[in-house]
A protein has these predicted regions:
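GHKL-family ATPase ATP-binding module
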Residues: 1-159
C-alpha cells in the first residue's frame, strides 16, 4: 500500500478482530504518509467495495479520533482536544473490510453501507487495538499527535 513512501509510523496500524458472535469480522490497515496530504480509504463490506463509505468508515474514524485524543490526554497535551476526525483522516491511507450478516446498503449500487451496527462493531474492534498500538510506539504516536495538532491549528486559523 505504501511500500515506496516515507510514513509517520514505520509500521502500519493493522489488525483483524472476529466478534463474539463468531460471524462478524473487521480487518484494517492504516498509515499516514510523511510527505503528502492526499489519502484514501478503501472500504469493503462482505468483499463489496463501498466507495461512498458508510457506517463502517464512521466507526473507524471515531475509533482513531478517540484513540489519539486519549493518547494526548495521557501525555498531558491539551491541544489534542481540538483534533477532529477530519484532522486524523486527512492524509491517511487506509484499508477497511468488514464481514457482517445482512448488511444494509444505500441504493441499488451498494456504494454506501448504512448498517447501524457496523459503526459500533468497527469502533469497538479498532479502538482498543489503536490504544495499545500507540502505547507500544511512543515515537510514532508523538509524530501522529503532532501532525494532527498541526492540522487542527491550521483548520482553526482558516476560520
Amino acid at each position: 500500500m505504501l511500500a515506496d513512501r516515507a510514513t509517520l509510523a514505520p509500521a502500519a496500524f493493522s489488525g483483524d478482530v472476529t466478534a463474539a458472535d463468531g460471524i462478524s469480522r473487521v480487518e484494517w490497515a492504516v498509515n499516514w504518509p510523511a510527505d503528502r496530504d492526499d489519502g484514501f480509504i478503501n472500504a469493503y463490506c462482505n468483499t463489496i467495495p463501498t466507495p461512498a463509505g458508510g457506517t463502517h468508515e464512521a466507526g473507524m474514524r471515531t475509533a482513531l479520533l478517540k484513540g489519539i485524543k486519549a493518547f494526548g490526554d495521557l501525555t498531558g497535551n491539551r491541544k489534542a482536544a481540538q483534533i477532529t476526525a477530519e484532522d486524523v483522516m486527512s492524509g491517511a491511507c487506509a484499508m477497511l473490510s468488514i464481514f457482517i450478516a445482512d448488511p444494509q446498503f444505500q441504493g441499488q449500487t451498494k456504494d454506501k453501507l448504512v448498517s447501524v451496527d457496523a459503526s459500533r462493531l468497527v469502533e469497538q474492534a479498532v479502538k482498543d487495538h489503536f490504544d495499545h498500538w500507540l502505547s507500544a510506539r511512543p515515537d510514532s504516536a508523538a509524530s501522529l499527535l503532532e501532525r494532527f495538532i498541526d492540522r487542527a491549528e491550521e483548520r482553526i486559523r482558516r476560520r
